[in-house]
Amino acid sequence: LRGTERKRELDQAIVTATLACVDDFGARGSNIAAYNPLSSEPGPADFAALLAAAARTLFLPISLPDGVLAWAQHGAKDAAGALGITEPNGPRFTSNVLRSCGLVVAPALAVDRQGMRLGKGAGYYDRALAGLDVPVAAVVYDWEVVDAVPHDAHDQAVDAVITPEGFFRI
């Protein structure tokens, strides 16, 4: 899909579906956590900027070398991070800042209808979300919604799934 007109169409539909999900969870105008997509991930390059318009503050992840995510506010000067992902500069927060969010929007490689999310296998998001009572929506393309994904006891289920076709709660 990379670089194609079809990907642009799907990614624009993901923005629309994500904003609808934000509204459904009552998170518009509250703090939201999201991500800057890699070219292989769902969402356009300006995904964070588009979501920031709906948030009081948009927090973006920063990958630390020890497999932990830190968070910084969108709008701080961006720089290439450790994993090649564009990350904001500025004050860093622990994942406890997610407690202030009305919604966490997370990328995934796949998600099943029970809400189990398949990430890239490093467990960054599972560690960040462990023990937090915050709604999480996984963003995938429609064909990445599957019957079942492999998961372990530490894997965190999501509360909603966002695709170009819309979103659904688990």
Locations of regions flagged by a protein language model:
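Conserved phosphate- and dinucleotide-binding cores of soluble alpha/beta proteins
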Residues: 67-170
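N-terminal active-site beta-alpha-beta segment that forms phosphate/nucleotide-binding
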Residues: 1-95, 99
